């Protein structure tokens, strides 16, 4: 693995200085820097991260949605949806994770970064398809993985594991048809391991 060109704590300070009051939180964990910015200033922050001389994050290498509604033991009490981006500076050999929370849980929306990095195009479509996060300014925001007639967003924590409908080919109609799911819900009993005499040990 190639050594990083800048120490994570130094990168944290560089990013904090470049973004100024656009930073809501910045941290280092496992030698990775994560910065949280507000949805209102997300686009502005991303432009700076690409163009600032000490940052030069020329590449967006990943972008995904996250549903925090079941995060942790009791679930998250903050905003439900976030968009997480991973940026790479090829010229400075450094990486950064950027997180932005959607301000409205009922209609999650953030600005599109496709005008800054065109690689965001399909990533944003995927986050829209699977989580229902709308990217304002995206010029072709439509589903990319699920079927055109699909209802709902399957990576949301409240989406049923079995889904709502199943599809099959109907030979009489000579087409694919949708039907309600026929899988019956069942109780799953958690496995209990008793410490006494576990595995035949005495």
UniProtKB/Swiss-Prot annotation:
Protein EC: 7.1.1.-
Pfam family, one: Complex1_30kDa
Enzyme class: translocase
Key words of the record: Cell inner membrane, Cell membrane, Membrane, NAD, Quinone, Translocase, Transport, Ubiquinone
PROSITE patterns: COMPLEX1_30K
Catalyzed reaction equations: a quinone + NADH + 5 H(+)(in) = a quinol + NAD(+) + 4 H(+)(out)
Keyword Cell cycle in record: no
Protein name, per record: NADH-quinone oxidoreductase subunit C
Record organism: Acidovorax sp. (strain JS42)
Lineage of origin: Bacteria, Pseudomonadati, Pseudomonadota, Betaproteobacteria, Burkholderiales
């Amino acid at each position: 693995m190639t050594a990083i060109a800048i120490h994570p704590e130094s990168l944290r300070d560089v990013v904090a200085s470049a973004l100024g009051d656009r930073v809501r939180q910045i941290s280092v964990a496992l030698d990775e820097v994560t910065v949280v910015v507000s949805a209102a200033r997300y686009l502005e922050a991303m432009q700076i991260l690409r163009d600032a001389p000490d940052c030069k994050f020329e590449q967006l290498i990943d972008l995904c949605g996250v549903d925090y509604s079941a995060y942790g033991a009791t679930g998250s009490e903050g905003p439900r949806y976030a968009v997480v981006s991973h940026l790479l500076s090829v010229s400075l050999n450094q990486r950064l994770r950027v997180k932005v929370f959607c301000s409205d849980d009922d209609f999650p929306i953030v600005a599109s970064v496709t005008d800054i990095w065109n690689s965001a195009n399909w990533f944003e479509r995927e986050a829209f398809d699977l989580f229902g996060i709308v990217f304002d300014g995206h010029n072709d925001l439509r589903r990319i993985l699920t079927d055109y007639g699909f209802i709902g967003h399957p990576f949301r924590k409240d989406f049923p594991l079995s889904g709502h409908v199943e599809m099959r080919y109907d030979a009489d109609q000579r087409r694919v048809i949708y039907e309600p799911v026929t899988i019956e819900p069942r109780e799953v009993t958690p496995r209990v391991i008793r410490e006494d005499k576990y595995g035949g040990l005495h």
